[in-house]
């Protein structure tokens, strides 16, 4: 019988901070014994319409920018930061995964 893989969905709960993201990976590995961590990747300009991007965050208290677009951009990591997280995962022995929300992010 094949053992199922346990995946920890980290998504954007790292608050746009690479060190928080890496700490979440380490915590998932150490305390939850998961096999895989999963993040998300979006190209905000592909993902949001101009109107959505320029609108305020629906819950201003939780926003990392003046607009929803700025908020979403703040939470996104660059390709180099994705590589840094992948290297951290390799170092501690956990699989890295990222779901993409648009074609540009997949390329």
Task: Tell me the role of every PLM-derived stretch.
Residues 29-33, 90:
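Non-catalytic positions within long, well-ordered alpha-helices that form the structural scaffold/packing
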Residues 6-8, 35-39, 96-99, 107:
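Hydrophobic faces of well-ordered beta-strands that scaffold small-molecule active sites
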Residues 15-27, 79-80:
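Glycine-rich anion/phosphate-binding loops
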Residues 11-13, 40-44, 101-103:
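Active-site beta-loop-alpha junctions enriched in small/polar residues
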Residues 9, 28:
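Conserved, mostly hydrophobic/aromatic
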Residues 35-76:
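Glycine-rich, proline-tolerant flexible connector loops at the mouths of alpha/beta enzymes
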Residues 1-8, 82:
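N-terminal amphipathic alpha-helix/helix-capping segment at the start of soluble metabolic enzymes
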Residues 59-107:
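Active-site beta->alpha loop and helix N-cap motifs at the rims of alpha/beta catalytic domains
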């Amino acid at each position: 019988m094949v053992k199922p893989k346990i995946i920890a969905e980290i998504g954007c709960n790292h608050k746009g901070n690479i060190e928080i993201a890496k700490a979440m990976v380490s915590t998932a590995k150490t305390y939850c014994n998961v096999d895989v961590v999963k993040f998300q990747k979006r190209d905000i300009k592909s993902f949001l319409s101009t109107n959505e991007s320029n609108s305020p965050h629906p819950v201003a208290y939780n926003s990392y920018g003046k607009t929803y677009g700025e908020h979403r951009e703040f939470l996104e990591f660059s390709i180099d930061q994705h590589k840094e997280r992948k290297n951290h995962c390799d170092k501690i022995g956990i699989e890295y995964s990222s779901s993409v929300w648009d074609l540009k992010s997949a390329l």
